[in-house]
Amino acid sequence: MRHAKAGRKLNRTASHRKAMFANMAASLITHEQIVTTLPKAKEIRPIVEKLVTLGKRGDLHARRQAISQIRDAAVVSKLFDTIATRYATRNGGYLRIMKAGFRQGDNAAMAVIEFVDRDTYAKGAADKARVAAEEQAVAA
């Protein structure tokens, strides 16, 4: 019986899950919003919230703990410099999960996970061009 066993296996080995969550956390910190399946979003939320709390601590040991989990120094510096300062007064609840319908191919429940007060300009290059074009249209 599987009583009192926390966490989902997601049909992956432990090392695959660990690597996947590290990559998803790095993507979420970089883009501040990702689209994934609902179970993956529910699993990644506490991981990233603990990383933000590490960023708010801000000391060298916290930075080393974050690097050991994410393994990307640029992402960790963004976490400690911009995201941690943004949520300095907020005690937890840094992320929101919104349901986003079902995937076409396998009918999997999809979700959007994003930072609560996220930077809307932290998206990809194509979206930045679209936002710039909209701002020029409004200014004209």
From Swiss-Prot:
SS bonds (residue pairs): none
UniProt xrefs under NCBIfam families: L17
UniProt GO cellular component terms: cytosolic large ribosomal subunit
Protein name: Large ribosomal subunit protein bL17
Keyword Ribosomal protein: yes
Record gene name: rplQ
Record text on subunit structure and interactions: Part of the 50S ribosomal subunit. Contacts protein L32.
Family in the record: Belongs to the bacterial ribosomal protein bL17 family.
Keywords tagged on the record: Ribonucleoprotein, Ribosomal protein
Entry GO MF terms: structural constituent of ribosome
Pfam families named among the record's database cross-references: Ribosomal_L17
Gene Ontology biological process terms, A to Z: translation
